[in-house]
């Protein structure tokens, strides 16, 4: 026997028993962004490697360690997309969607990072993101946060997530702070771990995000970014906080929150949970006003967020919010004998036409009554419809209840759709 081929490590199948929860989550996401007037954009999974080097930053974990990069047959360097924002900006620039325009966009699809697989973190993962272009004011920052809060409300997890906020200031403010932070770190270089020493000059703000306990203890005495902000940055952040308070969204200001991508400025945020252990961030984003220009477009203000769907699915399962999902099949249609098979198929088709949301499965492959009932039960259907010679002669259908202790019923064929509609 040939050796069985397995899925690649960190890239998982979503099986039929798991897909209803995914479908429920995806429906909530689509319906919510639709209610805010956002439009979907779909971009290729494979992009030029240079796109991510220029957007994410060459001295980041993603570009240095995690990207799936390869040369195609023309010798061009290509990369499986590790995130969605850069591709969205590239598409916006390429198709003239961004200059002097406002765009509210969303995307959903697979992303790829060569990380160590662990609970809630995979090498292929599915990301949902929101991107807004052309609006520089704090009210749109508040809107994307309100939208994210609405997602938690619809998923029933509002009580299990908290919002952390920070502002990174503009380019000049960060440059002044960067110099002060480097000077401080140079004085305490012996305390820094290897990762922080490497980042000290190339990307010093990422040192603030270090998980090393000694580094975090040192940073308690480090310069504070907010001390370097001018009036515009302070006013923008203050207005955002006022708007969130006005709509009842609670938040915590976290001055160490810097995000892992180079393109962020001003507002940054994360929604975090304590229900998933170390993988606590479930949604993250912020403002990236320089990215469109950085990728060849005209300077355009932008703000957005992204969330990993695997982590949301894991959270829903952890909180046992994955139980209230309807069956994969509502009605299973059986036929007793070859003479009844055609009518059984027609009845199934009539039900699908009359009840578009009903999930109707026809038995295929033959078999006696016992075998068909076994298949019906295994399908998860709440009822099985039995079409035999007697039922056919009387223009009736026998309804066998599979999940309730009820006697079998005979229903007139012309009343069947109404009966099933009330049942499911």
Curated annotation (Swiss-Prot):
Keywords: Aminoacyl-tRNA synthetase, ATP-binding, Cytoplasm, Ligase, Nucleotide-binding, Protein biosynthesis. GO terms for molecular function: ATP binding; histidine-tRNA ligase activity. It catalyses: tRNA(His) + L-histidine + ATP = L-histidyl-tRNA(His) + AMP + diphosphate + H(+). One of its GO terms (biological process) is histidyl-tRNA aminoacylation. Its EC number is 6.1.1.21. The keyword ATP-binding applies. PANTHER family: HISTIDINE--TRNA LIGASE, MITOCHONDRIAL-RELATED, HISTIDYL-TRNA SYNTHETASE. Homodimer. This is Histidine--tRNA ligase. It comes from Shewanella pealeana (strain ATCC 700345 / ANG-SQ1). The lineage of its organism: Bacteria, Pseudomonadati, Pseudomonadota, Gammaproteobacteria, Alteromonadales.
């Amino acid at each position: 026997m040939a050796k069985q081929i397995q899925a690649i490590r960190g890239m998982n199948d979503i099986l039929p028993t798991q897909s209803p929860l995914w479908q429920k989550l995806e429906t909530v996401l689509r319906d919510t962004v639709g209610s805010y007037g956002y439009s979907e954009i779909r971009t290729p999974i494979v992009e030029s490697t240079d796109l991510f080097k220029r957007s994410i930053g060459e001295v980041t974990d993603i570009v240095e360690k995690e990207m799936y990069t390869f040369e195609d047959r023309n010798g061009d360097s290509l990369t499986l997309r590790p995130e969605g924002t850069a591709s969205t900006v590239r598409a916006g620039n390429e198709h003239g969607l961004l200059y002097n325009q406002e765009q509210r966009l969303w995307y959903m699809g697979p992303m790829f990072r060569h990380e160590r697989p662990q609970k809630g973190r995979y090498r292929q993962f599915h990301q949902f993101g929101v991107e807004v272009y052309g609006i520089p004011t704090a009210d749109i920052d508040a809107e994307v946060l309100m939208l994210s809060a609405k997602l938690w409300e619809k998923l029933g997890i509002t009580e299990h997530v908290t919002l952390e906020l920070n502002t990174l200031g503009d380019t000049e403010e960060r440059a002044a702070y960067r110099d002060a932070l480097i000077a401080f770190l140079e004085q305490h270089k012996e305390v820094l771990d290897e990762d922080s020493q490497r980042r000290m000059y190339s990307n010093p703000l990422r040192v603030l995000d270090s998980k090393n306990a000694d580094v975090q203890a040192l940073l308690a005495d480090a310069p504070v970014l907010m001390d370097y902000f001018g009036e515009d940055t302070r006013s923008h952040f203050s207005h955002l906080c006022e708007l969130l308070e006005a709509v009842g969204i609670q938040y915590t200001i976290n001055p160490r929150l810097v995000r892992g991508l180079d393109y962020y400025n001003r507002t940054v945020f994360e929604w975090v949970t304590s229900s998933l252990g170390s993988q606590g961030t479930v949604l993250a984003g912020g403002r990236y006003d320089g990215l469109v220009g950085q990728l060849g477009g005209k300077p355009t203000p932008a703000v957005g967020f992204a969330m990993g769907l695997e982590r949301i699915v894991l959270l829903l399962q952890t909180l046992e919010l994955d139980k209230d999902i309807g069956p994969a099949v509502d009605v299973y249609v059986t036929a007793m004998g070859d003479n009844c098979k055609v009518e059984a198929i027609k009845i199934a088709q009539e039900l699908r036409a009359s009840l578009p949301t009903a999930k109707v499965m026809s038995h295929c492959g033959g078999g006696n009554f016992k075998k068909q009932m076994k298949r019906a039960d295994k399908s998860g259907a709440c009822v099985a419809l039995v079409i035999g010679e007697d039922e056919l002669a009387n223009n009736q259908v026998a309804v066998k209840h599979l999940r309730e202790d009820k006697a079998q019923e005979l229903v007139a064929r012309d009343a069947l759709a109404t009966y099933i509609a009330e049942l499911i």
